[in-house]
């Protein structure tokens, strides 16, 4: 399946976990450029880097990216996507994939898979992917776990391992780890801004819980490729440098 979709790469400058990380040098290029180059292989009809910082915007323009400046007002990611869609003039039926600006090792095929997943499930309001991880990985609060029904629609997402093992009837050895790349129709992004807030979102700091709280449907498929290391903190930079070829 190769239908039209757009990509928005969010590159917010002063993130609490790692300020200025979009501009982190990886083999002579800012990290955001490596992310952009991964996105180009996905078959998307348009790629937009959304940032609240002129330094990031100028760097992105220098390597040929389309840039959309967003407001520096602490919006959540989904609301920022809606702001970009409004500024780009995209219609409600346009499919948009959000691609994190700190995921330079993500294969292009993953981006296309999540866009295809939304098109394959027209009753879904959002589509995403997951990978199976060990209990050791699932124990980390930085990884978001999810559970699905028998049609792979998301029932809940959490920073603690779910399902929690109590009964001996079934031994939980692996967990579904949420890959934070989603596909939406632009119309849903615009609706999201006006949905009632969710205390579940506030408690877990997972904005997709606001969708579930308001009766929206999220379909999750297992990723068809391994997902590389993300740059969550400064310590991750050297790990990523080892995995990215110097001439890339």
How would you name each of these model-derived features?
Residues 48, 55-116:
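Short phosphate-binding loop-to-helix
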Residues 13, 71-77, 225-227:
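Short, acidic/turn-prone active-site loops that include or flank metal/cofactor-
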Residues 31-46, 58-63, 213-214:
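A short, N-terminal amphipathic alpha-helix
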Residues 1-19:
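N-terminal nucleotide-binding beta1-loop-alpha1 segment
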Residues 4-9, 32, 46-47:
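Hydrophobic targeting segments
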Residues 13, 52-54:
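Residues in the short beta-alpha loop(s) of Rossmann-like NAD(P)-binding domains
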Residues 108-196:
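Conserved core of the sugar-phosphate nucleotidyltransferase
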Residues 173-248:
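Conserved alpha/beta core of the MobA/IspD/sugar-nucleotide pyrophosphorylase nucleotidyltransferase superfamily
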